[in-house]
Amino acid sequence: YTLEEVVARNYLIQERPDAILNIIDGTNLERNLYLTTQLVELGIPVVVAINMMDIVRKNGDQIRIDQLAKELGCKVVEISALKGTGIDEAAKEAMQAAESKIPMVPQHKFCGCVEHAIAHIEEACLHDRPEAQQRWYAIKIFERDDKVLEQLNIPDRKSTRLNSSHAEL
């Protein structure tokens, strides 16, 4: 991880902002949505603002905003920073998300065996974490994220058990 990624992640986990306004490049949607899905897993309300929609349309492409919002489980708005359009709407939606204080419920589900492993990790070692963060931590443990494993300081016997269930997949 870069220093910027570590600082950003630590802030989101430790400070728990009221909402996240995730501005992504509409011309490179796939790469940007990976981060978006990780943000949604944090349980913090997220608003996605897709930038460069004017260029997306100019290129003859389209993004189904309603479908994307449904799949992500959060508000999605179109913006163009160059033209200054949609920015007020994005800010308004982010404020509403922050004021609602309703935690995100991730819509994305993995295949059954992975979901089972994530649930097992949550039950085995995350009961001391806030409920809204448990899924994110479980996914990171499943991914064997070194920073998270170090932060959580999971005892060796639990780590061995988790690794054996991971190996079964």
Model-derived regions: residue spans:
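Canonical P-loop GTPase G-domain recognition
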Residues: V56-H108
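Single conserved hydrophobic/aromatic residue that forms the stacking wall/gate
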Residues: L162-L169
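Long, well-ordered amphipathic alpha-helical subdomains in the mid-to-C-terminal portions
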Residues: V105-R161
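Flexible beta-alpha connector loops of hexameric P-loop NTPases
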Residues: Y1-T2, M53
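Conserved C-terminal guanine-recognition region of P-loop GTPase G domains, centered on the G4
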Residues: V7-K75
